[in-house]
């Protein structure tokens, strides 16, 4: 049978020292959590700035390779060690072509590298030629309906075209792309899931 409690059996009230110790532990936990959040944010910023970042495709200029709404990962690190290769799909800031009203300098573009520095390029009868050799392009939406006379790509620049050639605002409209404008190479599509995979 339970004995009735007596005054000397009651739990003593919390002391000021006990309350202070509990408060200190709480603030220590809050500080640790804040440090974790801050470190995570810094790492995310560094990764996005220097390593890789996600991108969204808003236009049809790269159809059929990329569809409107595709979400990609852009590799921002590789071009620090080597130059772009022909065939790379690159994300870049458009050059200073402000006379073209449909180009927004704050919006990044995505196109395919076709001509490299020192290479001779021309478009004739629906075919791209590099150094007088026809370029095999099995990724095109349809045959090219414009022509370009022969030219040589200058040093420090590349010639880029969209895969949807006849509906792409690219080098055939505004000229060469300075390499320094390139943000990175689009290499992986992570959405939609049924089209998940590398970009070639």
Feature-to-residue mapping (PLM):
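Mid-length scaffold segments of soluble, non-membrane domains
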Residues: 108-134
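A broad, structural micro-motif
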Residues: 57, 108-110, 123, 153, ...
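Protein maturation boundaries and topogenic segments
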Residues: 1-108, 179-200
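Acidic loop->beta-strand submotif enriched in PP2C/PPM serine/threonine phosphatases
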Residues: 141-156
